[in-house]
Curated annotation (Swiss-Prot):
Compartment list: Host cytoplasm
GO cellular component terms given for this protein: host cell cytoplasm
Keyword ATP-binding appears in the UniProt entry: no
Gene: OPG173
Record keywords: Early protein, Eukaryotic host gene expression shutoff by virus, Eukaryotic host translation shutoff by virus, Host cytoplasm, Host gene expression shutoff by virus, Host-virus interaction, Inhibition of eukaryotic host translation factors by virus, Inhibition of host adaptive immune response by virus, Viral immunoevasion
Record-given protein name: Protein OPG173
Superkingdom field: Viruses
Length: 74
């Protein structure tokens, strides 16, 4: 008996392969491989986020308590 194979390849999902004959049915699900372009885009976004964090760190103002005023509980 010939084996029948169906492959479903989605642009956004996993690759699903269904193989069957009269004796058994096999379903394989594999994660979609990222294209090199998508990986480079993700890396550039990560670099931009890192730059944003550095800018935010520069804008932090430290407030020091030097007024010598103590609060006493009575």
């Amino acid at each position: 008996m010939d084996k029948i194979k169906i492959t479903i390849d989605s642009k956004i999902g996993n690759v699903v392969t269904i193989s069957y004959n009269l004796e058994k049915i096999t379903i394989d699900v594999t994660p979609k491989k990222k294209k090199e372009k998508d990986v480079l885009l993700a890396q550039s976004v990560a670099v931009e986020e890192a730059k944003d964090v550095k800018v935010e760190e520069k804008n932090i103002i430290d407030i020091e308590d030097d007024d010598d005023m103590d609060i006493e509980n009575t």
